[in-house]
Amino acid sequence: MSDVSTQSPKVGFVSLGCPKALVDSEQIITQLRAEGYEISGTYGGADLVVVNTCGFIDEAVQESLDAIGEALAENGKVIVTGCLGAKKDAAGQDIITSVHPKVLAVTGPHALGEVMEAVHTHLPKPHDPFIDLVPPQGIKLTPKHYAYLKISEGCNHRCSFCIIPSMRGDLVSRPVAEVMLEAENLLKAGVKELLVISQDTSAYGVDVKFRTGFWNGRPLKTRMTELVGALGELAAQYGAWVRLHYVYPYPSVDEVMPLMAEGKVLPYLDVPLQHAHPEVLKRMKRPANAEKTLDRIRAWREVCPELTIRSTFIAGFPGETEEEFQTLLDFIAEAELDRVGCFAYSPVEGATANDLPGALPDEVREERRARFMEVAERVSARRLQRKVGKTLRVLVDEVNQDGGIGRSSADAPEIDGLVYIAPPSKPYKRYKAGDFVSVKITGADGHDLWGEV
């Protein structure tokens, strides 16, 4: 990596966890560059290292602790931030400092100010920061053609299996003008896809009572429907996509369906359902009802037949009976969800679900997860097969010797399927990463599509 100035202090950065944590990392790196710090691609080339951690499940905790240990071994000066920074062990002690007492500082998630204060303490900032080196859209860790747009922080739900509210706090919605300005800067920089994220996108603005803000001289409510409409209008000026994630199936989501049917935003919803049996949902403390959800899904598809629905579920939750699990399998088959992920229940330290009776053996949880995925993949394969012979708009993510790899409107990066594109048969059909291309679909399996331009 080339150096802009050999005099500038260098910071190494490790980012772990979900897209929301990735946005936190982008904000920290943007501020570091704004203050004149350089970002080092190696531990050895850095004056100190910042590690943004994940603490949601045991595997993520261990990955974060391992990353901290590696940074300490390779560099020696480490500042830790992120969700694991807010977690305590059974004795009430900070998990990170009890395992790695030599870290310089520890903060929780969404702690830009605290991280920068720690950096300033251990690596004073340059006297003449090069503000002009930082692009208006900030420093991004995603490929340049797509970006995550975080609209709020925290969550008002208290699901029994989750500890995110204890780490990230209650819902705090970003001002609508601030969100729109960030979106505009990203689109001006060439981003082709905005992925709207939060802990609960449907609840955007609840905490400020849907306060009216202003954007480009016109009033705009701090509310999901109005924000999504404005983002769709803005993205249309650049020929870009807007994709919605973490959307709870509240009645207000019905208002977004016409926007999807009209092509203003992608006909795609990431809806975290988790289960379908009412008793399991009750134990999970989830705000959902399977019958109402089925009715809502049918109504959505009537308005927008092209709608793709992705969701995640938990198999083997404490107390889950075979009958309750079968209800979940029946729901998956009936709802015909396009994209589905499933986790075998794993206890999370600090979650109230740990105190529920009826914990299931590991082998039962894993067996149910496998059965669930068999059903889900059959549904997905049927729905994907319907696309064979159609021509889809595809955003190219990568080009290699075998052709291209991209995504359709039904595929979010990292979590959904891919479209494998044959090499162009003629020079005028060439494409590169970040291009939109029309792809005729020639084949499908349970997850991916194949086609040609």
Curated annotation (Swiss-Prot):
- Binding-site residues for [4Fe-4S] cluster 1, renumbered to this chain: 18, 54, 83
What positions does the domain TRAM occupy?
A: 385-453
Instruction: Look up the EC number in the record and give it.
Output: 2.8.4.4
Q: Offer a single GO CC term for the protein.
A: cytosol
* Keywords from the named record: 4Fe-4S, Cytoplasm, Iron, Iron-sulfur, Metal-binding, S-adenosyl-L-methionine, Transferase
- Main location class: cytoplasm
InterPro entries, per database record: Elp3/MiaA/NifB-like_rSAM, Methylthiotransferase, Methylthiotransferase_CS, Methylthiotransferase_N, Methylthiotransferase_N_sf, NA-bd_OB-fold, Ribosomal_uS12_MeSTrfase_RimO, rSAM
Please tell me where [4Fe-4S] cluster 2 binds in this chain: 155, 159, 162
Q: Name one Pfam family in it.
A: Radical_SAM
The answer to keyword Secreted applying to this record is: no
Q: Which GO terms describe its biological process?
A: tRNA modification
Q: Which domain of life is it from?
A: Bacteria
Cofactor binding mode and count: Binds 2 [4Fe-4S] clusters. One cluster is coordinated with 3 cysteines and an exchangeable S-adenosyl-L-methionine.
Q: Does the keyword Iron apply?
A: yes
What cofactor does this one take? Answer: [4Fe-4S] cluster
Q: Report the residue ranges that make up the Radical SAM core domain in this protein.
A: 141-382
Family, as annotated:
Belongs to the methylthiotransferase family. RimO subfamily.
Q: Which PANTHER family match?
A: RIBOSOMAL PROTEIN S12 METHYLTHIOTRANSFERASE RIMO (PTHR43837), RIBOSOMAL PROTEIN US12 METHYLTHIOTRANSFERASE RIMO (PTHR43837:SF1)
Q: Which NCBIfam families match?
A: 30S ribosomal protein S12 methylthiotransferase RimO (TIGR01125), MiaB/RimO family radical SAM methylthiotransferase (TIGR00089)
Could you tell me what this protein does? Catalyzes the methylthiolation of an aspartic acid residue of ribosomal protein uS12.
Protein name (Swiss-Prot/TrEMBL): Ribosomal protein uS12 methylthiotransferase RimO
Q: What is the lineage of its organism?
A: Bacteria, Pseudomonadati, Pseudomonadota, Betaproteobacteria, Burkholderiales
